[in-house]
From Swiss-Prot:
GO molecular function, one term: rRNA binding
Pfam families according to UniProt: S4
InterPro entries given in the database record: Ribosomal_uS4 (IPR022801), Ribosomal_uS4_arc (IPR022802), Ribosomal_uS4_CS (IPR018079), Ribosomal_uS4_euk/arc (IPR005710), Ribosomal_uS4_N (IPR001912), S4_RNA-bd (IPR002942), S4_RNA-bd_sf (IPR036986)
Domain of life: Archaea
Role of this protein: One of the primary rRNA binding proteins, it binds directly to 16S rRNA where it nucleates assembly of the body of the 30S subunit.
Assembly, per entry: Part of the 30S ribosomal subunit. Contacts protein S5. The interaction surface between S4 and S5 is involved in control of translational fidelity.
Gene Ontology, cellular component aspect: small ribosomal subunit
Domain S4 RNA-binding: 108-170
Keywords: Ribonucleoprotein, Ribosomal protein, RNA-binding, rRNA-binding
Gene Ontology terms describing biological process: ribosomal small subunit biogenesis; translation
Name the record gives this protein: Small ribosomal subunit protein uS4
Lineage: Archaea, Methanobacteriati, Methanobacteriota, Stenosarchaea group, Methanomicrobia
Length: 185
C-alpha cells in the first residue's frame, strides 16, 4: 500500500506525448490561465476525470434499477458537492457532470479568480500575489494558487490584512485595472 505520508502523483500524463492538437490546446490553457506548467492542466483533467467516473457509475446504478433511493441519494450528493465547488449551476444534472471541460475547473482556481475580480493585472501577477501571501479568503491568507475556491468563499477573496496592497494608494494597486470582459461578481 505504501507509506501514507508520502505524496503520490495527483495527475496522469498523456498517453500520446507528441500529439500536436493536444499540445497546442494545453499551451493555450497554460498561457490563458497563467499556469506554471502543463502539469497543472493535467491535474485539472484528473480532477474532472474522477467526477466523470462517479457520474458514469451513477448512470450504471440507475440502469440496473436495483435501488432507486440509493441512486437518488448518491446523485444528489454528487451534484450538491459540485455545486458547492462552483463547477455546476443550480439546475444541473448528471449529463452536466459528464459535459464538464478543463476550463471550468481552471476557472475555480484562486489564481484565476483573483485576476477575474480585478485584484491583479494579469494571471501571472495573480499567481505571484497569491504565492507571496497578499491574498486572503475570509481573512485567512492562502498561498496556494491552485486552491479551488468554493462558491461561498468566492465573495470573500480580498487582499490580506498585513499586505501593502490593502492601502488603496499603493503604487502597484493604482496600476491594476479591471480586465476587459471579466464577469466580476
Amino acid at each position: 500500500m505504501g507509506y501514507p505520508g508520502k505524496n503520490h502523483k495527483s495527475y496522469q500524463t498523456p498517453k500520446r506525448p507528441f500529439e500536436k492538437t493536444r499540445i497546442e490546446e494545453e499551451t493555450r490553457l497554460v498561457i490563458e490561465y497563467g499556469l506554471r506548467n502543463k502539469r497543472e492542466v493535467w491535474k485539472a483533467q484528473s480532477h474532472l476525470r474522477k467526477y466523470r467516473k462517479a457520474a458514469r457509475e451513477l448512470l450504471a446504478l440507475m440502469s440496473s434499477a436495483t435501488n432507486q433511493t440509493v441512486f437518488e441519494a448518491k446523485k444528489s450528493e454528487l451534484i450538491s458537492h459540485m455545486q458547492r465547488a462552483g463547477l455546476l449551476g443550480p439546475d444541473a444534472d448528471i449529463d452536466n457532470v459528464l459535459a464538464l471541460k478543463v476550463p471550468a475547473q481552471l476557472e475555480r482556481r484562486l489564481q484565476t479568480l483573483v485576476y477575474r475580480k480585478g485584484l491583479a493585472r494579469s494571471p501571472k501577477q495573480a499567481r505571484q500575489l497569491v504565492t507571496h501571501g497578499h491574498i486572503a479568503i475570509g481573512g485567512r491568507r492562502v498561498t496556494v494558487p491552485g486552491y479551488l475556491v468554493t462558491r461561498g468563499e468566492e465573495t470573500t477573496i480580498s487582499y490580506a490584512g498585513k499586505s501593502p496592497f490593502v492601502d488603496a494608494s499603493h503604487a502597484e494597486r493604482t496600476r491594476i485595472t479591471r480586465p476587459t470582459g471579466a464577469g466580476v461578481n
